[in-house]
């Protein structure tokens, strides 16, 4: 074990003195993961992975199990908070050029994909109307795979439709994947501390470092406490804020909801999927909406790592954030004008960020050379 890892364990790791609050979300994500694993374990004790009993078992947890309603609500709200933190974490990485630490960025992208899969499997487990139909629609995208599509879909379903084997399989995957996420998180942290954390200026922090504890550990505690306060306020006053009303009805394969949609944190990808009127094209765009993050280190052309001193790049970045919110909003709307056109335009803007960013980098380099 290297000296860096010994320092990491003893919490004395030297860290740049100027890292801001945006660097606290990593520890908040780790706290969320621990909380989700613990609450998920207690829920799994009382949950029954059977299409006839799953919905009733969730009601049983809420009504009859001591403090079951707290466990269930923390787990459901915790998933949304988890995704809020991870999207901020990724946005911070894009803004400050942290993707230049390639190994950390790639392990983080793998973590995001695993997390999204885990959350999707978890959304199906209550076996409500939206759970069932979201599972049917999303898994049906596997049929878009040329030649093997139908075979892969039947194998994934465990039959010829979303049924009992599908639910049992999803429960097994939802139980085991968080431990995969925990393992990947360990790799992510070890890779990060091989080179050390960057800072808002994007410069080398070696000349000005302070011990992680107590300076940054107290900042982490403050942000984690704020996160818990937000969670418990939602739990106390608006426990169903992130829930879909359709999911309070038991799954019925004979009645299709008027508007099928996944949880809010998948809506940006779902909106991109819906904006393309071709099944294979939409599926590829859905996958690309997440995997395109892998291209960031290879398309960085600017001489300056961070966007702190790049006003043009900042404009492009905030356009991406606005686009992300717009796609999320349009995905909640029916597939009809003007939402179809807005969704298609927003999808083009979303992907154009990853094309415009390197072009803007070259432009900024030229401007800097002209002024120097």
UniProtKB/Swiss-Prot annotation:
A ubiquinone binds at residue 193. Gene3D superfamilies: Cytochrome Bc1 Complex, Chain C (1.20.810.10). Pfam families: Cytochrom_B_C, Cytochrome_B. Heme b b566 binds at residues 89, 188. Its cofactor is heme b. Binds 2 heme b groups non-covalently. Heme b b562 binds at residues 75, 174. GO terms for cellular component: mitochondrial inner membrane; respiratory chain complex III. GO terms for biological process: mitochondrial electron transport, ubiquinol to cytochrome c. One of its GO terms (molecular function) is metal ion binding. It comes from the Eukaryota. It is a multi-pass membrane protein. Keywords: Electron transport, Heme, Iron, Membrane, Metal-binding, Mitochondrion, Mitochondrion inner membrane, Respiratory chain, Transmembrane, Transmembrane helix, Transport, Ubiquinone. Its main location: mitochondrion. The chain crosses the membrane at residues 25-45, 69-90, 105-125, 170-190, 218-238, 280-300, 312-332, 339-358. The cytochrome bc1 complex contains 3 respiratory subunits (MT-CYB, CYC1 and UQCRFS1), 2 core proteins (UQCRC1 and UQCRC2) and probably 6 low-molecular weight proteins. PANTHER family: CYTOCHROME B. Heme 1 (or BL or b562) is low-potential and absorbs at about 562 nm, and heme 2 (or BH or b566) is high-potential and absorbs at about 566 nm. Component of the ubiquinol-cytochrome c reductase complex (complex III or cytochrome b-c1 complex) that is part of the mitochondrial respiratory chain. The b-c1 complex mediates electron transfer from ubiquinol to cytochrome c. Contributes to the generation of a proton gradient across the mitochondrial membrane that is then used for ATP synthesis. Belongs to the cytochrome b family. This is Cytochrome b.
